[in-house]
Amino acid sequence: MTAAQIHSDCSVHMLPRHVKEDVEPIHLLGFNIARKPKWLQFVLLSLAIFILYIGYGYMQELIFKLPGMKPFGWTLTLIQFLIYSGCGYTECIIWHNTKRMIPWRIYGVIAFFTVATMGLSNASVGYLNYPTQVIFKCCKLIPVLIGGILIQGKRYGWIDIGAAMLMSLGIIMFTLADNKVSPNFDSRGYIMICGALLADAVIGNIQEKNMKKYGGSSNEMVLYSYGIGSVFIFAFVVLSGEVFSAIPFFLENSWKTFGYALILSCLGYLGVNVVLTHIKVFGALVAVTVTTLRKALTIILSFMLFSKPFTIEYVYAGSVVMLAIYLNLYSKNKTSWDNMIRRFVARAMGYHDVSVARKDPMTV
């Protein structure tokens, strides 16, 4: 055996060790951020969620401002699902990640709840004041806590439970304010968004549990859940007859309907991927907290960009929800926040030599 053969043979046998030591990739819009510090991963993923979903919220409200669009929320959802599926397949080909890791039966369940979440959410926009829809979605923490207990057997402290109760109070206050000032108050919108909220909470827990159990990627999750979901929605819009009225409407206003839907879907697809990555890296509850903060900003922008009735009671209700969000954030970062509070109090009282337990500032 030649020296070159020996060297080649040794290299082949040593290669798997180096591969095993490689860090599992974490992709953000095509860039691998796995080797970045944990806190920077959190900042980058959270910032991407803010940018993509604020744009998504703007386009969603804009498309439902089109005259006659109100009854076609499910058709819009079908377009979104088809685009998501196509993008997911393209990404799987690009990253050579075509092997399915998660069983079909689980994807069937995830697809059902994904359809319920996005379909009911889109449909509710036609019947609700948009900030009301968003404030309901801000309170997904409530069913996420319940789902975490029932699906994953998690236990939560009294702070998380208190945050959920405050969110419930905020929802009630916002609904009463909406009923007071909205000229076209429609209870169907509330039923739809509550259904979407419950389904969305179930999705987060099922996705987190099975992505960790089977090692499935976010691209795979998007491809199969939205691909199967497209079949479900197509069957629904055909059986309900919605598609036969929607096609002439979409063709008549093709630049706005299909154009807005394309932009909405692209922003949504990128956002879904980032959220799934956030869930895989930091868990469902932390991801919900980040997306909830983003929705609070969306509400402010909605009042600024689109004319709608306003009452100060919206501010009170939103403040209660924001308090609940920060209470939840405190629960997830209790040690580091307690240390910062001790330092602040000590400095305010004139003490400079204060010992506090050191901990990673990015506890999630």
Curated annotation (Swiss-Prot):
Keyword Transmembrane annotated: yes
Membrane topology value: Multi-pass membrane protein
Keyword Transcription: no
Record's GO cellular component terms: endoplasmic reticulum membrane; Golgi apparatus; Golgi cis cisterna membrane; Golgi medial cisterna membrane; Golgi membrane
Keywords assigned: Golgi apparatus, Membrane, Transmembrane, Transmembrane helix, Transport
Compartment list: Golgi apparatus membrane
Transmembrane segments: 39-59, 74-94, 106-126, 131-151, 157-177, 187-206, 231-251, 257-277, 281-301, 310-330
Family: Belongs to the nucleotide-sugar transporter family. SLC35B subfamily.
Protein name: Adenosine 3'-phospho 5'-phosphosulfate transporter 2
Organism annotation: Caenorhabditis elegans
